[in-house]
A protein has these predicted regions:
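C-terminal accessory/tail domains of diverse enzymes
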Residues: 1-41, 47-58, 65, 90, ...
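Active-site palm subdomain of RNA-directed nucleic acid polymerases
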Residues: 65-74
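Short, conserved phosphate-binding/catalytic loop or strand-edge motifs used
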Residues: 75-82
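Structured core elements
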Residues: 82-84, 193
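Catalytic palm subdomain of template-directed nucleic-acid polymerases
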Residues: 86-88
Length: 257
């Protein structure tokens, strides 16, 4: 599908006498017909099992052979791969555990994905503020869903985070989420919205499966309570105010042990 809201006129039909609205709709449709030749297109899949992931890499191979390019093809490009891993449980403490694991690995993920300078500069997949990270990693933080949603959207009133929790929170309590952030683009679903990786479809060595496996590191850490507690304590005590690169080095060394 075309990656431009402007190229998709609203589904609402203007009243018969509203000449300005009808003219605007015609203009939007005409502009959409023109810009569809250079606007990027998105590949959107329905929910799929992990076993089907190789079909995405095969699709990328075929598109690459037809001339498709990704972020690295131009300094002007800021294309991404967005994954929506289904949550194993909607229990707030389970979601919080995985979220904490992500916060601990996010600096490392940002480094190993080698996100382009343009995507780093643009607002669409920004890291969480360090003070919010510290609050979530605090040992005494045990929110229920209403408190978690309140704290998250008060500190992050945006979809533009590297791990967007808005769709998941809307699935749990849509009215509460939209009371904080009235954005029609938030679509409720029982998944995380992982927005960090670049699309490098023009590179034969690049793989959607590689990006998925990097996400799996988050789930593995979350599934190891002892390791999660140790990583949390180390980060909070020594690295929360340190340069990002220091924690990246520490995390890389820990993952290689």
């Amino acid at each position: 599908e075309l990656d431009s809201d402007f190229a998709h006129p609203s589904a609402r039909s203007p009243t018969e006498g509203d000449l300005m609205a009808r003219t605007a709709a015609i203009a939007r449709a005409a502009i959409g017909d023109v810009i569809e030749h250079w606007m990027p297109r998105e590949i959107v899949t329905p929910p799929m099992p992990i076993e089907a992931l190789p079909t995405l890499d095969e699709l990328c191979r075929r598109l690459r052979n037809l001339g498709a390019v990704g972020t690295d093809a131009s300094w002007r490009y800021a294309f991404s791969v967005q994954l929506n891993p289904e949550v194993p449980s909607l229990a707030c403490d389970n979601v919080l555990t995985i979220f904490r694991s992500f916060l601990l690995l996010s600096d490392w993920l940002r480094a190993v994905t080698a996100q382009s300078m343009l995507r780093r500069a643009l607002p669409f997949a920004q890291p969480f503020p360090r003070n919010y990270v510290g609050a979530v990693l605090a040992a005494g933080y045990r929110p229920d869903w209403p408190e978690f949603i309140h704290d998250y959207l008060t500190a992050n009133p945006t979809r533009n985070r590297d791990l967007d929790l808005c769709p998941l929170m809307a699935h749990v309590d849509e009215a509460r989420v939209h009371a904080y952030l009235d954005d029609p683009r938030i679509k409720a679903r029982p998944t995380f919205h992982y927005r960090l990786p670049d699309s490098r479809i023009e590179d034969p060595a690049w793989s959607v499966i590689t990006e998925w496996n990097r996400w799996v590191a988050v789930e593995r850490l979350a599934a190891d309570p002892e390791a999660l507690a140790e990583r949390t304590a180390t980060f909070v005590r020594y690295f929360i105010d340190a340069p990002e690169s220091h924690w990246v080095q520490e995390t890389s060394a820990w993952l290689e042990r």
